[in-house]
Regions:
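Flexible loop/hinge segments that line or gate small-molecule binding clefts
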Residues: 123-157, 270-278
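Short, well-structured alpha-helical segments in soluble
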Residues: 86-100, 226-240
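Extracytoplasmic "Venus flytrap"
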Residues: 40, 45-70, 79-89, 109-111, ...
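Short beta-strand elements in bilobed, periplasmic/extracellular small-molecule ligand-binding domains
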Residues: 74-83, 210-223
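Periplasmic-binding protein-like
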Residues: 101-109, 126-130, 240-249, 267-269
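C-terminal region of N-terminal signal peptides and the immediate post-cleavage residues
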Residues: 22-41
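An alpha-beta-alpha
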Residues: 67, 164-213, 217
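Conserved small/polar residues in nucleotide/adenosyl-binding loops
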Residues: 284-286
Length: 286
């Protein structure tokens, strides 16, 4: 039984909106503007993944699906560039620039330093980065701000604390239904702002539902290796966790596996991860 299941189209649709916003803000500022219909056929949008790769069934994959949806709906050209290691970051950005991409999107926090270097070197190229804010932004939810004020870079920030809040409230309710001591857990990847804000919202609203609930929080230090998240999750299960929430990309699939093997509920992130564990309680990505 699942309480709710959101399809992957939610994440994809969100990325389409992000892409549209990026196009309007970055490309629309160009002095020579063609009509949308005339320009779409030649418009090239590139996406550089982090080391989680496009098959992480989470963060990177959801962005790729959003890009592909933009291709279908907006009829733009796309260029996904997968990073297998951090040494691929610079070459992938270079490939996008050589291909004359109209906008190159960096998939998240781990690419920030590289993006800043590239943006400085290629001031005429347009970039965007998810889970980050441009320097001088009037509002930045995650608190992750680029070091320099790049006129050619757009930051894309999410209210992940609100999504985390909904998940925390739901987890607390499910724990209550199971009876006994109320314990839930959260397994993060790296201890970075985009992850911390998810977990902060999760903990806050779990406590809002039940002030006496115990919320266990752990980090794997990784976004890729599922066994590392599985180890953290198993430790939380041993402490009585009744529901586990993962915020760790592909690594977090290990959290869902551990929960399923223990007969407990797991909560996925970024994409519908029900098929990966069969005990996923809900997916919420807003």
């Amino acid at each position: 039984m699942r309480v709710s299941r959101r399809s992957t189209s939610i994440a994809a649709a969100a990325l389409v909106v992000v892409l549209l916003g990026a196009l309007a803000a970055l490309v629309g500022s160009s002095s020579s503007q063609a009509s949308p219909k005339a320009s779409n056929a030649t418009f090239l949008a590139a996406l550089v993944s982090d080391i989680g790769k496009f098959n992480d069934r989470s963060f990177n994959q959801s962005q790729l699906e959003g890009l592909k949806r933009a291709q279908r709906l907006l009829h733009v050209k796309i260029k996904p560039l997968q990073s297998n290691t951090t040494s691929d970051y610079i070459p992938n950005f270079s490939t996008a620039i050589r291909a004359k991409s109209n906008i190159t999107i960096a998939a998240g926090f781990l690419l920030a330093d590289t993006l800043e270097t590239v943006a400085d070197k290629f001031p005429k190229s347009k970039f965007a980065i998810t889970d980050y804010c441009a320097k001088g932004a009037t509002k930045c939810i995650t608190g992750s701000v680029l070091k320099k004020n790049h006129k050619n870079v757009m930051g894309i920030d999410y209210a992940a604390n609100q999504s985390g809040c909904l998940v925390g409230y739901l987890a607390a309710e499910m724990a209550k239904k199971q009876g006994g001591k109320q314990v839930i857990g959260a397994v993060g990847g790296l201890h970075i702002p985009p992850v911390d804000i998810w977990i902060a919202g999760y903990q806050f609203c779990a406590k809002l539902y039940n002030k006496n609930i115990t919320v266990l929080i752990g980090y794997s230090g990784d976004f890729v290796a599922a066994d590392k998240c599985k180890t953290v999750a198993e430790n939380q299960l041993a402490q009585g966790a009744q529901v586990l929430f993962q915020v760790a990309g592909g690594c977090g699939l290990g959290t869902l596996t551990a929960a399923a093997q223990a007969g407990k509920w797991g909560i996925g992130v970024d994409k519908d991860q029900y098929k990966d564990a069969k005990r996923v309680l809900s997916l919420i990505h807003i």
